[in-house]
Amino acid sequence: MIIKPKIRGFICTTTHPVGCEANVKEQIELIKAKGKIANGPKKVLVVGSSSGYGLSSRITSAFGSDAATIGVFFEKPSSETKPGTAGWYNTAAFDKFAKAEGLYSKSINCDAFSHQAKQQVIELIKQDLGQIDMVVYSLASPVRKMPDTGEVIRSSLKPIGQTYTATAVDTNKNTIIDTSVEPATEQEIADTVTVMGGQDWELWMSALSEAGVLADNCKTVAYSYIGTELTWPIYWHGALGKAKMDLDRAAHALDSKLFATGGSANVAVLKSVVTQASSAIPVMPLYIAMVFKKMRQEGLHEGCIEQIYRLFSERLYRVDGQAPAVDSENRLRLDDWELREEIQQHCRDLWPLVTTENLSELTDYNEYKEEFLKLFGFGIDGIDYEAEVDPNVTFDVIEL
């Protein structure tokens, strides 16, 4: 079929398999160009490995450190009438390129919150790898099916205490709008913590630990975003922020357990990037368009892959073997460049000046749109989008 982008709300409902493969290849080439990570991990589990930071973590582990990787994700293959999800094609491409270089690559398509997923991963590690030395937790799911009861809990992207009103961009109409989001109820806050907090990360780590598949020096990291006062009402001070604070709680608990065997657990606070997850958060697309332009001008721009390479090479696996610098909450801060005062002041000054007419001129909004489409395999140089492509891409995947 010939596949063109179709946007609905903040998601693109179509994907291009050849474009997704090109994206993955581009990330791999970038890692290869940066060079090997001297003390990098060798056997890595990535929970939430099919897009965004999770995918970049799998690529960095495999191609930056020659690691064997197991990826866990929830994606859909193509059907008779429509292509598969971007994450399906991303993982198929990763698997192809990893195996071509003789790297161990196993993928499990499942509900990562389930007991079954954890058991399958444990069996796979015991059978093929013995133990693992790195666990990346990078789930970005709006819902969680509770593994014991089957109850489905939903998260909310809402402020706490009062209605949040701010200037935002309507990404469908490319216009500047005022958006208002009603505050979350106590139940919605609690549910958001249940879905996006640290509980499932802890469940993964205890299941792996009890099964004896964690190596003595095993590191684990989960990803977070804090941002600044520009996005705090909807993010850090909102329901989502409460979940991310629970991730901090989990990191402290896990770190004290792993410390005994020479391991560690940290939250890594990353910069804002264009991902399927961030595009769903009100105000984030406009903020990203502003901050990206300034960071590009300052030569500080990073995408997911650059961030994760820096996390691995300069924080978790330093050449000198020293412990990484952390903040007062034991977090690894990779948002340090974005939070520079001159960058943030620029955004604070610019925010009230942006209109529909000057949006493309004052910000990198056009680039934001391009990067968003690229997530789904569209708008990539060298690909003929008028050509017929086969949406049915198969690879070595365990379906649960």
Curated annotation (Swiss-Prot):
Entry EC no(s): 1.3.1.9
List of residues binding NAD(+): 48-53, 74-75, 111-112, 139-140, 244, 273-275
Gene Ontology biological-process entries: fatty acid biosynthetic process
Domain of life: Bacteria
UniProt pathway annotation: Lipid metabolism; fatty acid biosynthesis
GO molecular function terms listed in the Swiss-Prot or TrEMBL record: enoyl-[acyl-carrier-protein] reductase (NADH) activity; NAD binding; trans-2-enoyl-CoA reductase (NADH) activity
Positions of the catalytic residues: 235 (proton donor)
Enzyme class: oxidoreductase
Keyword NAD: yes
Chain residues that bind substrate: 225
InterPro entries assigned to the protein according to its UniProt record, in alphabetical order: Eno_Rdtase_FAD-bd_dom (IPR024906), Enoyl-CoA_Rdtase_cat_dom (IPR024910), FabV-like_NADH_b (IPR050048), Trans-2-enoyl-CoA_reductase (IPR010758)
Subunit architecture: Monomer.
NCBIfam families for the chain: EnoyACPredFabV, PRK13656.1
Primary role: Involved in the final reduction of the elongation cycle of fatty acid synthesis (FAS II). Catalyzes the reduction of a carbon-carbon double bond in an enoyl moiety that is covalently linked to an acyl carrier protein (ACP).
UniProt record similarity statement: Belongs to the TER reductase family.
Official protein name in the record: Enoyl-[acyl-carrier-protein] reductase [NADH]
